[in-house]
Amino acid sequence: MKQDIAAKRTVEYVQSPNSQEDKVPYDAKEDLHWDMELVLVRHGTTLWNKERRYMGHSDLGLLPGAEQELKPLQEELQGQSFARIYCSDLMRCRQTLQIIVPESELTSGGSLSTMSPMMEPRLRELHFGEWDGKTYDMLKDVSLYRAWIDEPQRITPPGGESWTDFVNRLRKFLDSLYEWRVAMEVQPMDLTAAPPSVLVVTHGGVIRQLACMLIPGHDFWSLNPKPGEAFRIQLRLAGPHNYIAEMLPH
C-alpha cells in the first residue's frame, strides 16, 4: 500500500496542468490526500486490569515488572522515527511511554528529535462513572448495567461519559491529525518518501473505537488489544471526517 500511495501521489502532482509558478498549496487541491502510519499502543498492565475491573478515568499506575512486560515492544520501536508522539494523560499511559520510548532516545534523536510527546486528554478511556473500579460480578444484577452492555450507544453509566461524547472526542483527535498532516506539506516535497509515522499510547477501548471508525468491516469487538500490544494502521486522510485505513500485519 505504501508504494501504491507514493505512486498515486506522484502521478497526481506530475500530471497537474499548472506551471511551477502556478502550483498551489496541497490544501487547495481537492483531489489530494495525505498519508501516515498510526502506531496504536495499549498501556501496560495495572492492578485493575489484573482484577478485571472497569478502569476509565481512574488514574492507576502500572504494576511492578512493567519494564519486563513492555520490553518486546520497546525493542520493536527502538530506532523508529516518529513525526509525532501522542499519549493519554493518564498515569498508566505516561509510564508506558517512558518505558517504550525512553527519555534518552527522545533527546538523542533515536525516536524523535524535533518535538516532545504531547499529553492528550482526548485519548483517555471511556469514563465509566460510578462503575469505575467495579467488576462484572459486582454489576451483573444492575438493570442499567445490563442495558448498557446491550446498547452502550444509548445508555450512559451513572456519572460517566456518553458514547456520543466518547466518539466525538476521538473524531476531533483524528481531525487534528488531518490538520497537522496537511500543514506539513504546504509546498510539495519528496512524494516518494514513506509517510510519516505517529505513535499513539492510549487505552484498549480507544484503540477498538479508532479501528472501528477507520477500517471498513471493523466493529468495536474486532480487536482485543492486550496490555503492551501495538497495532499499525496505514492511514489516508482525504479531508475532515474522511479517512481510508488498512490494518498492517504485526
Predicted regions and their residues:
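Short glycine-rich phosphate-binding loop at a beta-alpha junction
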Residues: 82-89, 185-192, 197-201
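Short, hydrophobic/glycine-enriched beta-strand segments
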Residues: 35-43, 200-201
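Conserved histidine-centered catalytic loops in small-molecule metabolism enzymes
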Residues: 31, 80-122, 234-250
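Phosphate-handling substructures
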Residues: 103-172
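Acidic, low-complexity terminal tails and accessory targeting/binding regions
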Residues: 2-37, 128-137, 179, 183-196, ...
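Active-site-proximal alpha-helix that buttresses catalytic centers in soluble enzyme cores
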Residues: 13-17, 21, 36, 45-109
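Short active-site segment of divalent metal-dependent hydrolases/proteases
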Residues: 46, 206-207
